[in-house]
Amino acid sequence: MTPNAATGLESLGLKEFLETNANEPLDQIQHHGVTGETLLTIDRRNCRDTYGTAYYQLHRADLMAALIDQFGIGNCSLGKDLKNCTQDGDTVNLEFADGSSAQADVLIAADGLRSVVRDILFDTPAPVFSGHMAWRGLVPAEKLGPEYTQRENNNSLMPGSNCVTYPVRGEELVNVVALTQADDWVEEGWAVKAQKAELLSHFEGWNDHVRGALEAIPDDAVYRWGLFLREPLERWAVGRIALLGDAAHPMLPYMGQGASCAIEDGTVLGRCFAKADTPEQALEIYQKARIERASFLQRESNAGGDRLLAMNPYDLRDKPIKNEDTLDIFAYDPVTVQL
């Protein structure tokens, strides 16, 4: 959770939650994948002074629970599979797979990278497999040594692969994310079970930190997903319907900005409704305020994968790099950006 998103969450009253429940890394450390040699250290201690808030690491489920605690569940209906939506004057009509229907004044479609609403509103081409595969697992920290729960974000890199570890939920869990290359892949989703032996085969001979983390993932808790490319959209809104988050700007994870960009969206959208006289006007202001920023993040994130996985690890030490800092991504403030 980078400062550009933390600013938005703090404006919603979640500053105490973040400071109490999220981990705040002091450094992001880049290592040689095989030798473990430290090649680059990025200081994150200065985020509060530079951006007014911190760089956080936290469990997504904990953030969702905090949002529910802050705002309540309202009249939320879970398990609904949207099949169609239409507009009629000042009403949005929704039809669900179970035969039920609903009406609303406005529809904000935060229905993910395989958004049904996006495909209804716009003629979007099919996603293209990037050639990259992501793997993930959560490890109980008690299964690992104390070096895994330090206030650090550790990334080990070799051409074609990298592996990141960092603690979440205090010192209770360690998140492990690995990225590899693949010739083809069909499924696009976060919940595809994988074999740990296959994951380990991609990291034979790697440093002890990486091998220890991967081997400690419970056998039944290894997941993988293919990473697919989509081009930025020219519009997000039509009438009283608009897209938000991955539905609007699905991006690869190489800048760590997917969730942060969605939080930016939500923060700005709330301001647009406060500013506008009609829902249509609010959504028009919203898309004008957000598309350029989100499209920039989407393009840079998508390009970042090719840069990272093609990189000689010593380039991190010996050559200028392009990352979140050089692109000044964290300086964006969704609370004050001009609408």
Write out the residue ranges for each language-model feature.
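Acidic/histidine metal-binding catalytic segments
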Residues: N21-A22, N75, G205-A221, P279-E284, ...
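Conserved N-terminal helical subregion
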Residues: T2-P140, D183-E187, V192-L200, V337-L339
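C-terminal auxiliary extensions adjacent to catalytic cores
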Residues: I321-L339
